[in-house]
Amino acid sequence: MNNNIIHYTLDTLGLRCPEPVMLVRKQIRHMQNGEMLLVIADDPATTRDIPGFCQFMEHTLVRAEMERPPFRYWVKKGK
């Protein structure tokens, strides 16, 4: 993560599916390609939904901490 600057942080603690992914999508729409978003979540569904979202939308999941909540995801905007 040395060269990856976090440009935005999105706290979705307490929110449940589908809200975290909807908020990630909304935030990424307003970002430039290559910018990094740190997502903090405690919904177990995000361990499946956020990696799936990144793959489907062609963003890069740079790093994920999914061992126990709060989960953290570093998402770099693609395209």
UniProtKB/Swiss-Prot annotation:
PROSITE patterns linked to this entry: UPF0033 (PS01148)
Domain of life (superkingdom): Bacteria
InterPro entries for this protein: Sulphur_carrier_TusA, TusA-like, TusA-like_sf
Active-site feature positions: C17 (cysteine persulfide intermediate)
KW Metal-binding (keyword) present: no
GO molecular function: sulfur carrier activity
Keywords: Cytoplasm
Record has Cytoplasm as a keyword: yes
Subcellular location: Cytoplasm
Entry GO terms, CC: cytoplasm
GO biological process, one term: tRNA wobble position uridine thiolation
Similarity section: Belongs to the sulfur carrier protein TusA family.
Functional note: Sulfur carrier protein which probably makes part of a sulfur-relay system.
PANTHER family found in the cross-reference section: SULFUR CARRIER PROTEIN TUSA, SULFUR CARRIER PROTEIN YEDF-RELATED
Annotated protein name in UniProt: Sulfur carrier protein TusA
Taxonomic path: Bacteria, Pseudomonadati, Pseudomonadota, Gammaproteobacteria, Pasteurellales
